[in-house]
Amino acid sequence: MLNFASRASCVTRRQASLYFVKNQGPRLIASTIPSCHWPLRAQGVQPNYPLSLRFYSTDKSKSVTKPVAPTSTDAPAKPKETLMVKVKHALKHYANGTKLLGYEIKVSTKLLIKFAQGYELSRRERNQLRRTMGDVFRLIPFSAFLIIPFAELFLPFALKLFPNLLPSTYESGKDKQAKRNKLIEIRKKTSEFLHETLEESNLITYNTIENAEKKQKFLNFFRKLYSAKEGKIMTFQHDEISAIAQMFKNDSVLDNLSRPQLAAMSKFMSLRPFGNDNMLRYQIRSKLKDIMNDDKTIDYEGVESLSQEELYQACVSRGMKAYGVSKEDLVDNLKVWLELRLRQKIPSVLMVLSSTFTFGGLPKENYSKAFSPLAEKKETKSKYDDLLDLYYDGILQVLSSIPDPVYNVAKLDVSESKSSAAETEAEKQVAEKKIKTEEKPEETAIPKEEATAKESVIATTASAVTPKLVVVNEKAETAKTEEISQEKENAEPTDSAEATEAEEKKTSDDNEFKLNVLKEQEELIKKEEEEAKQRASREHVPDDINLDEEEEAKSVPPIPADQAAKTFVIKKD
């Protein structure tokens, strides 16, 4: 019964399908009927096709689904721009750039007149004037392509070879983005290279500083840094790191870096590594000098006064990651830089080298060896505190991987500063002793003068009294007066001889002192001349930029503009 029912159902289904095919047009029949049965099509005979068996799986654990062809819901691809459209866009871009350049020249002329009249320009106005002057000077070689006939045909090739030939107003957004991506890649590569080279250099071991006694603070820090206990991670406070970092001068660190390290550092600072080692050092020094001056102006005007683009440029020039970073993070990074540079007096070279370790920003899970006791007391640490710990950790990594020459130079500087302080104290003591010895003969000379004055007073009183007395024996008195006069005459040359001897001694002592001073000065001049000859033989590029701030200049930084007094008093005559 089951087979009959299933067979009947199959017949009815087949008849229905044949009926559907029969009632369709010849197009459908030709497409559904094989070619071997086409002769029967004219007679209206339709062949009976056996239906294929269908098997269904009884396993319900796996659901077999046929792949469905994806429906194309994506937007249609944009057609490529034609040559005329590209030319129109280029002409419009250069027209807008020309208008912008003219407007900047107009504004910069007013700023130049303001500066010529003696007014002080702000940081934004100074950058505007500098950028416009650079664009105007770039127009000089660019004008040659406009003056020379048919030279504009070679302009695309010239721009390909020299991309900075055009002023900054003609730079497109794609070019800016390409420069940013290239700068990020270069900084990543150079930071990795600096890490490897600093780690491969000869580090300081415990044996090299074991016998030192005078530089306790300096050597204890490195002893703690390189002799970590087993199972414990040594931590350092911010005060310890800043105190040791201040001992490494900018010039001493730069002078002892190798050629590959200088080239990588110049690339990291967006400088071209062209020339010998002295030229690279000169370029890095001049760039750092500009950054140091810019730090003071930003600190005075306030970080909040900068726009988004100005914050981006300031962070990029200092080696920070700025692309894709929010404005709040840029402000925090710049505040941390100013705190370490101006308040803590950390050298700029160490700051740039530490930025190679902190280029990626704050990691998600970080453990810092540097901590601040003030920040630890807070319940919730701010992002500023985390960034401060990150930068101190970067400085600590730079100090832990400093080569031997830099360490030895810093160690000598510390010992020389201590020995010079001891020498100055000894010189002061010797000078005080000389002053005391000079004061003693003056004190002894004062009683002699007083005694002679008393004798003269007594003699005058005696001469005044003698006329009143009764003279009995005039001869005896005259004899006594003659004897007294002779004694006085004999006493006067002795006193004059003693005075001349004392004066000769004083003059001889002064002359000897002056001669000694002149001899010392001549020796110092000879040493300086020898050192100058050695420097002239070594160095070919004059480098007179000194990045180390003087001790006298280590005063309180200027008061920011927002904290300054809003009123002032003018004294009237």
Swiss-Prot record:
Residues 408-440, 503-541 form a coiled coil. GO terms for molecular function: mitochondrial ribosome binding. The keyword Cell inner membrane does not apply. The chain crosses the membrane at residues 139-159. Residues 425-453, 477-491, 502-543 have a biased composition (Basic and acidic residues). Residues 160-573 are mitochondrial matrix. GO terms for biological process: intracellular potassium ion homeostasis; positive regulation of mitochondrial translation; potassium ion transport; protein insertion into mitochondrial inner membrane from matrix; proton transmembrane transport. Residues 417-455, 477-573 are annotated as: Disordered. It is a single-pass membrane protein. InterPro entries: LETM1-like_RBD, LETM1/MDM38-like. Residues 182-404 form the Letm1 RBD domain. Disruption phenotype: Leads to the absence of respiratory complexes III and IV in mitochondrial inner membrane when MBA1 is also missing. Residues 1-56 form a transit peptide. Residues 57-138 are mitochondrial intermembrane. GO terms for cellular component: mitochondrial inner membrane; mitochondrion. Involved in mitochondrial potassium homeostasis through the mitochondrial K(+)/H(+) exchange regulation. With MBA1, plays a role in ribosomal translation and protein insertion into the inner membrane. Present with 7390 molecules/cell in log phase SD medium. The matrix-exposed C-terminus contains a 14-3-3-like domain which is necessary and sufficient for interaction with mitochondrial ribosomes. Interacts with MBA1. Binds to mitoribosomes in order to recruit them to the mitochondrial inner membrane. This is Mitochondrial distribution and morphology protein 38. The gene is MDM38.
